[in-house]
Amino acid sequence: MIDIDRPKLEGSVAVGEGRRIGFAEFGSATGRAVFWLHGTPGARRQIPLEARTYAERNDIRIIGLDRPGVGSSTPYSYPNVLSFADDLATVADTLGIDRFAVIGLSGGGPYALAVARAMPERVVVTGILGGVAPTMGPDAIDGGAMVLGKFLAPMLPVIGAPIGRVLSSFVRVARPIAEPAIAIYGRLSPAADRELLQRPEFKAMFLDDLLNGGRKQMEAPFADVVVFARDWGFAVGDITGPVRWWHGDRDHIIPHTHGEHMVHLLPDAKLFTMAGESHLGGLGMAVDIITELMAVWDQEQPLIPR
């Protein structure tokens, strides 16, 4: 296992109603800001080491955010996906960030789109990596993991918390065997994801993220599923800013057709198909993804310094 540096800055921000949202910063403290929204499950450190190094060298400030119940974030149930945007806005204000890009991986995708919808004047560009699509309403599409999620969603407000507590307890007890557990998950994954999880730097990142995700981290994914299965609170087609979407054509969790569907709905979007890649493919292309988003930033806001 390789060594992994701590974030440049790590803490939490008060977002109202007695709640806090945890964050971790990587890269340059004065560079262009990129909010990175983790997958389901995940936490604030679920950011590839290559992306952190690239950000440091290219004057980019990456901020990973915990969702409610993860890390130092207060447990909370959003009424819909759009409600998350208020919390991110408060974090951005507190950290002195005006304009920014936002990246959402998998379950972070809906929240990234919500931020783009709620703050078009602040979000310069949005990147989605294998993002979840709506399951109800005019923007809905069937298939993938959310078929089961939609079925379970009505029960999760009751059973999700106790199941999550058991799983979180297992994570704490299993710290000495966390690395073998990640290896086992990799062996059960499709070839592309398995190869990524065998790379020492990604194994180290996932292990670090898992062990710093807090004592309730396994309850939070159930809250994600519940809110994903509802009306999101906005129409995908109302997002006016540029969106760049990366999706593996062998994604076994969120099918590639979901990416095609979402890009068709978005007014200003481009789909990058990752040939031969599965659900985690975007993590292995993090530098290319950030480079693309910064190029769009240059086109959209050429006078804003890095």
Please provide the spans of the model-predicted regions:
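Conserved HGGG/HGGXW glycine-rich cap/lid loop of the alpha/beta-hydrolase fold
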Residues: 19-72
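Short alpha-helix in the alpha/beta-hydrolase fold that links the catalytic acid
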Residues: 49-50, 241, 255-264
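Conserved acidic catalytic loop of the alpha/beta-hydrolase fold
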Residues: 83-101
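Conserved hydrolase catalytic core segment
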Residues: 99-143
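Alpha/beta-hydrolase
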Residues: 147-234
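Short beta-strand/loop motif that positions the catalytic acidic residue
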Residues: 239, 245-247, 251
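Catalytic active-site module of serine/aspartate enzymes centered on a nucleophile-bearing elbow/loop
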Residues: 268-306
